[in-house]
């Protein structure tokens, strides 16, 4: 388990099981093998000396939780680098909230592709950029390039947050689903490239 909210969820499950007659001593051995859901506060470990976290977070509440987790794992003088966008056709009211949280709590932000549906993705990102007061976010439309840029920016002890897509292997476009390699694969590829360049 990693983030505090994962622990709270697990404790809720234990409480429900206990309330339904399962003894705590019977439940505990199963906790040793609990696996995190892909895309839910998923740590990417590929030999790098900085943290990479993939999470589905797309609401102000979930951003608050994942930024709290990032603050707990980032080195004392480390940076938090966030890559995210917002889905089209449904996230209008969430855009200011997620942008403001990132503006207040990140050290660098790259606004990038999400699920545009029938909206113009660049228009969504340009709107989101207007909510930033402290930071000047970069806009890199191509999500793979945005993740590459975040990895290039990261130093030892930093934390990269890849938010909004989780384990999705597609983008929702006007025409339907378009294949995407996933944030996990994009991050691992970017890390492998960065490590190879150091050799």
Cite the ranges covered by each PLM segment:
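ATP-dependent carboxylate-amine ligase
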Residues: 3, 12-199
